[in-house]
Amino acid sequence: MTTTAPFLTGNQIRDRFLQFYAQHNHQILPSASLVPEDPTVLLTIAGMLPFKPIFLGQKQPDFPRATTSQKCIRTNDIENVGRTARHHTFFEMLGNFSFGDYFKEQAIKWAWELSTKVYRLPPENIVVSVFEKDDEAFKLWEEMIGIPPQRIKRMGEKDNFWKAGPTGPCGPCSELYYDFHPELGEDNIDLEDDSRFIEFYNLVFMEYNRDAEGNLAPLQNKNIDTGMGLERMAQILQKVPNNYETDLIFPIIETAANIANIDYQKATEKTKVSLKVIGDHVRSVVHMIADGITASNTDRGYVLRRLIRRVVRHGRLIGIEGQFIKQVAETAIELSENAYPQVRERESFIKGELEREETAFLKTLERGEKLLAEIIEKTETQGQISGVDAFTLYDTYGFPLELTQEIAEESNLTVNIEEFEAEMRQQQERSKAAHETIDLTVQGSLDKLAEHIHPTAFLGYTDLQLTAKVEAVLIQGKTVDTAEAGSEVQIVLDQTPFYGESGGQIGDRGFLTGENLVIRVEDVQKESGIFVHFGRVERGSVSVNDQVTATIDRACRRQVQANHTATHLLQAALKKVVDKSISQAGSLVAFDRLRFDFNCPRAVTSEELQEIEDLINTWIAEAHETEIAVMPIETAKEKGAIAMFGEKYGSEVRVIDVPGVSMELCGGTHVKNTAEIGLFKIMSESGISSGVRRIEAVAGPAVLEYLKVRETVVKDLCDRFKIKPEEISDRITTLQSELKTTQKELEAVKQDLAVAKSDQLLTEAESIGEFKLLVSDMGEMDAKALQTAAERLQQKLGEGAVILGSIPSEGKVSLVAAFSKKVNQEKQLQAGKFIGQIAKICGGGGGGRPNLAQAGGREPSKLSEALLTAKEQLTESLK
């Protein structure tokens, strides 16, 4: 008997996945941040990324089984977003993971049970693939699950064999596909046919280790890594033609369509692509900003900026002028806030960042349009804009090729697409390595270096300055013999006092010096025991085998270790005040601030935050000595030392003990006495994902700086309003009330003016047979007042048509059409269609109901022409 899968919302799909695996003893873990701890990738691009050190055997997990819904960002196929049914930049990956616990048989059994019993997918609609040599998986699917062999497809290594890199953990995988058209039969199943099949669940069986010769040896601990795309499962269960029309994304698309006065269902394919891009990208930017990413010209900040700019560009392509992203972002926030409450809590920050970027890019686009005008002028006689010029506009000014083509077409010019695509391919080749895959191996050069040099000896717990030998010099990740002054370098030493970033603590800063040599070290990272010092050669040159003096910045180190010990005190205070079951989910320990993420199902109250702050400052004032000891891990656990999930611990561990207050396993640097911290101040508490909270704080001298800024703001407010500090809150409430009243009064005045002006225009209406026609330029009247005037005029005129236009103060065109019911029925005229066509004269578009519609344009100089055309056409049509 054929079953029918029930409709489930995106939230229901996510919850049922997590609860299913929780019932099978999997620990539900919150989504990691989109900012990964892994320095080899810019963004979290897969559900397994947070577990990478566990899969590589570098860390021991606290749980043998885990399940997550992980936020992910991928931009390697950004040009396909909106053009295919399933490409996205932002997506959620549902996953279940086994760390040396269950393996292939159980993973397959649960995947089938989840798919057919929980989601109730018809078994006859599921096709699976296995690695061509994985007879065990084939047999399990056929004999244990009962899938007919013709619906089990053997695939090659390219499709169904996962590997970490040239060497390391690897294994076959098995994928579950949904068949939208099982009636086509099982004779010629082609899983590449994405109009019929969609892959929705991937099971990776990590069971081998590949050596340098390519030989495979069984792993001692076999792991399971799976991924189910939430958006793909939503498409299947909600029975929509693509991921974009699911309840996870489509409300965002609808918001953008409404702003542009577009009916999505009736829109052209080109317009739908732009709306889908907006829907996808807005999800990305909202979550990126919520996770602390800000727009910039480098690294993940550039990814954010690029996505925001693409939203603006596609908005212009569908006729949206001016700022609009904040409105669309509000819908994205509404859709995500239940699963990821931090998007609502950081709403003002998200919208502020979007507004700043949108404003700046609109100015950039104006400059791009000017440059395009110059290019058109110089190429008019040639009949074609070069691909190089088009790519410069695209790459430097963010000017989309489609927009360049449209504007060029108006001047009877084409664009050299082949040349443009050649430039694009060159750029993609330069950048694809940073985005394509997760690299679970040591970065290229370091991988080779590790074969020739020993791990760096870290002596920085006791030595803040020492002499060391230069083992390697790298520029842009490539080894060189010598680096000259001005070079940005990465230096590997045989021993170092510099702490390498780990455990949330940033790397030390300082200098490497020698005879006529100065290298300013700005950061230190470590990979597989090798410490890499990132810096700039400020004087002289540095070569392999040179002797240098390595000196850390003591002031920075003091502040970092004060913040690190303060972080331990913060966790202890949270356990004491809020809930003893609270555990660390992440942290940042910098020289100027600290951040602590922790598992907690609710917000910490303001009263609790004050109690936590007071308790920490009490511990600081009590001047507790910090005791640091190395001991067997079992001894540390017996003493009650706190360990963090996901961290790798050896048989011997380093324990940081503030007697009677806190005891944690930690490899970071710390104060000798809590009194060295000085002061502690909580700046904020917020949610960053479902069940995970974040506290940001400052300690030591940074507290005084923080309070100084606050004091300056308070003093400025008191001086400006001639009030006392304790009166500020009441004054703000009063001002808000007055502003709200004033805004209402202003709106009423605008409406009164619109009514008055519309009454004056009644005498200008012309009679055309049994109908009245009024077409008028309303000056700078805003869009809302324009609509009020049009509706009132049409009601007073009776049977007929009213067309009004204006150029509001922000400099864009607004148009309104109001038609009587008789005009709709007898003359077959629709206000929406009519005003949409007229708006094209002003370089815009719009639409609406048959009796009332609005439109806009971006060429105010053509308003008179548009109104004249409207009058001529209606005069003819109403006869």
Swiss-Prot record:
The entry's keywords: Aminoacyl-tRNA synthetase, ATP-binding, Cytoplasm, Ligase, Metal-binding, Nucleotide-binding, Protein biosynthesis, RNA-binding, tRNA-binding, Zinc
Co-factor binding comment: Binds 1 zinc ion per subunit.
Protein name: Alanine--tRNA ligase
Main location: cytoplasm
Phylogenetic classification of the source organism: Bacteria, Bacillati, Cyanobacteriota, Cyanophyceae, Oscillatoriophycideae
Family of this protein: Belongs to the class-II aminoacyl-tRNA synthetase family.
Annotated source species: Crocosphaera subtropica (strain ATCC 51142 / BH68)
Gene3D superfamilies in the record: 2.40.30.130, 3.10.310.40, 3.30.54.20, 6.10.250.550, Bira Bifunctional Protein, Domain 2, Threonyl-trna Synthetase, Chain A, domain 2
GO cellular component terms given for this protein: cytosol
Residues that coordinate or bind Zn(2+): H564, H568, C666, H670
GO biological process, one term: alanyl-tRNA aminoacylation
Domain of life of the native organism: Bacteria
Domain notes from UniProt: Consists of three domains; the N-terminal catalytic domain, the editing domain and the C-terminal C-Ala domain. The editing domain removes incorrectly charged amino acids, while the C-Ala domain, along with tRNA(Ala), serves as a bridge to cooperatively bring together the editing and aminoacylation centers thus stimulating deacylation of misacylated tRNAs.
